[in-house]
Amino acid sequence: MSLDLPPPPARGCRSTEVLKERGQREVFCGLTGIIWLHRKMQDAFFLVVGSRTCAHLLQSAAGVMIFAEPRFGTAVLEEKDLAGLADANAELDREVDRLLARRPDIRQLFLVGSCPSEVIKLDLHRAAERLSAHHGPAVRVYNFSGSGIETTFTQGEDACLASIVPTLPATEARELLLVGALPDVVEDQAVSLLTQLGIGPVRCLPAHHAAEAPGVGPNTVFALVQPFLGDTHGALTRRGARHIAAPFPFGEEGTTLWLKAIADEFGVSADTFEAVTAAPRARARKAVAAASEGLRGKSVFFLPDSQLEPSLARFLTRECGMSAVEVGTPFLHRGILGPDLDLIAEGPVLSEGQDVERQLDRVRAARPDLTVCGLGLANPLEAEGFTTKWAIELVFTPVHFYEQAGDLAGLFSRPVRRRAILRREAAE
């Protein structure tokens, strides 16, 4: 059966030499992952062991007031903690005791490291083991780092899920595991498509509740829905699970190839695949064509932010008619992103890490039609006449699978359209 997709390029970018940069970075820390994880995991609580700056970041980013009792909070390290004048472990134990007494619905507690806790070498791994022994089995305590010293933006989710994997129950069952946090409506769409293909049981990590945690074993196969889950990928592989490599489900082509890789793994017939995917594929294609009209023939430059960049570059170049000048990403995991890189025609610079001043020099030299970058860089670039897209929106907006393909294209076309309108108004 032909999938009716454009042929792959003669030479992709998988073997392209990567420009590795290790300079000043302009990116959020891994604590920001808590913003979407606390909404997804409904019996979990994320306790950041950090400073008031950490608390302000989370409260501002989440858009909630602390008296609304969200499923996250900050155990603030005071000056006496930082100076070693107080027993930080004893203070932490007291805070956890108070929290669990006040919130008996908590079944998973994550101690999240920050820059201050890293600086004073507070051993949160040992603290998690101690608190799990004290409060278990009703509450399991995990730890991971969201420190800006160690992590960037989406790595917080990766560290969180990787901390869960060793505790998942063992199973010999043949199961498909979808790995990565998605909005509920998008996750439901994915599971529905897979169920219609006759694939199951389908389990998800992270689960909504601790009691729904999936098992993992040698008969588990897993598909990533987010490209930034390198540590989680490694943890699952060590448990015996096998990764189904595929482009990520952004746009019509990415979603089709992602589903096809899973369908082939489970022996789904070509006729069944066509019957299930034909209608949503047609809707996605139509939506992308309409939303990307203003993008065709234009160039895009990705500054590193979320690790979604290679997959999105594939979407823009293959489905929206753009050309990529540079695809920058905080970390490039070829084992995970290889199928996407195969579909990006040779030509753009691939860069890993960041030296922000040098990258900005390359942006100014290339003069791309659209620059995808972090919040802190967007306004200065706009002031210089560049058209920018906030990279953070691509993480917080539902953009996966067929029904969101048009919305994804629209996120890129809106700033281009806005710039064109402003130019017309200025000319008048």
UniProtKB/Swiss-Prot annotation:
Q: What is its EC number?
A: 1.3.7.7
Keyword rRNA processing attributed = no
Q: Which InterPro entries match?
A: LIPOR_BchN/ChlN (IPR050293), Nase/OxRdtase_comp1 (IPR000510), Protochl_reductN (IPR005970)
Q: Name its co-factor(s).
A: [4Fe-4S] cluster
Describe which pathway this protein belongs to, using the record's wording. Answer: Porphyrin-containing compound metabolism; bacteriochlorophyll biosynthesis (light-independent)
List the GO molecular function terms. 4 iron, 4 sulfur cluster binding; ATP binding; metal ion binding; oxidoreductase activity, acting on iron-sulfur proteins as donors; oxidoreductase activity, acting on the CH-CH group of donors, iron-sulfur protein as acceptor
- Note accompanying the cofactor annotation: Binds 1 [4Fe-4S] cluster per heterodimer. The cluster is bound at the heterodimer interface by residues from both subunits.
Q: Any idea which UniProt keywords this protein has?
A: 4Fe-4S, ATP-binding, Bacteriochlorophyll biosynthesis, Chlorophyll biosynthesis, Iron, Iron-sulfur, Metal-binding, Nucleotide-binding, Oxidoreductase, Photosynthesis
Signal peptide bounds = none
Q: Name one GO biological process term.
A: light-independent bacteriochlorophyll biosynthetic process
User: Which reactions fall under this protein's catalytic activity?
Assistant: chlorophyllide a + oxidized 2[4Fe-4S]-[ferredoxin] + 2 ADP + 2 phosphate = protochlorophyllide a + reduced 2[4Fe-4S]-[ferredoxin] + 2 ATP + 2 H2O
Positions of [4Fe-4S] cluster binding = C29, C54, C115
Keyword Iron-sulfur appears in the UniProt entry = yes
Q: Spell out the subunit comment.
A: Protochlorophyllide reductase is composed of three subunits; BchL, BchN and BchB. Forms a heterotetramer of two BchB and two BchN subunits.
UniProt record similarity statement: Belongs to the BchN/ChlN family.
Q: What does the function comment of this entry state?
A: Component of the dark-operative protochlorophyllide reductase (DPOR) that uses Mg-ATP and reduced ferredoxin to reduce ring D of protochlorophyllide (Pchlide) to form chlorophyllide a (Chlide). This reaction is light-independent. The NB-protein (BchN-BchB) is the catalytic component of the complex.
Q: What is this protein called?
A: Light-independent protochlorophyllide reductase subunit N
